[in-house]
Amino acid sequence: MELFLTGVVLKPKGLKGELKVKPVTDFPESFLTRREYYIGKTPEDAVLRKVQSARFHQGFAWLVFEGAGSREGAEALVGCGLYVTRDALVAMPDDRAYIHELIGLDVFDETEGRVGKISDVLQMPAHDVYEVDTGDRKVLIPAVEDFITETDLEKGMVRLKRFKEFL
């Protein structure tokens, strides 16, 4: 089963097992409605836990999980990731995509044709950057409209312009 990271447990609060969670999703409001997460240091060791209560405050989710209703139970989860299955992911708007959907897409330049595949997406402060593996080297392309002209998940491709500028 493939799991996707949506948050990271930072620290416990109080004596009743409440956890401060840093969202790593574009949809932090989903923490208020999601009733279960896989929790673990890695996706491979994550176990399913039910949410007992959830609130959102100052950019962080505050969660209590069943079976972790004490400070000691909460402390054991510090540093763990909160994961969800693919079918539990929030649907992206048409003009957006999850990183896992972009990795592996073929990259085409408007004049050069196919130039490689997206091998990674780097999340930078200003905008994402696509790492394109050309076979000979890896090239970093800013994921902005000035360079990316089309992203088609169904066709499995990204079209860009001015690829030679990055070589």
Swiss-Prot record:
Keywords: Chaperone, Cytoplasm, Ribosome biogenesis, rRNA processing. It is found in: Cytoplasm. GO terms for biological process: ribosomal small subunit biogenesis; rRNA processing. It comes from the Bacteria. GO terms for cellular component: cytoplasm; ribosome. Signal peptide: none annotated. The keyword rRNA processing applies. One of its GO terms (molecular function) is ribosome binding. Residues 94-166 form the PRC barrel domain. InterPro entries: PRC_barrel-like_sf, PRC_RimM, RimM, RimM_N, RimM_N_sf, Transl_B-barrel_sf. An accessory protein needed during the final step in the assembly of 30S ribosomal subunit, possibly for assembly of the head region. Essential for efficient processing of 16S rRNA. May be needed both before and after RbfA during the maturation of 16S rRNA. It has affinity for free ribosomal 30S subunits but not for 70S ribosomes. Binds ribosomal protein uS19. PANTHER family: RIBOSOME MATURATION FACTOR RIMM (PTHR33692:SF1). The PRC barrel domain binds ribosomal protein uS19. NCBIfam families: 16S_RimM (TIGR02273). Belongs to the RimM family. This is Ribosome maturation factor RimM. It comes from Chlorobaculum tepidum (strain ATCC 49652 / DSM 12025 / NBRC 103806 / TLS). The gene is rimM.
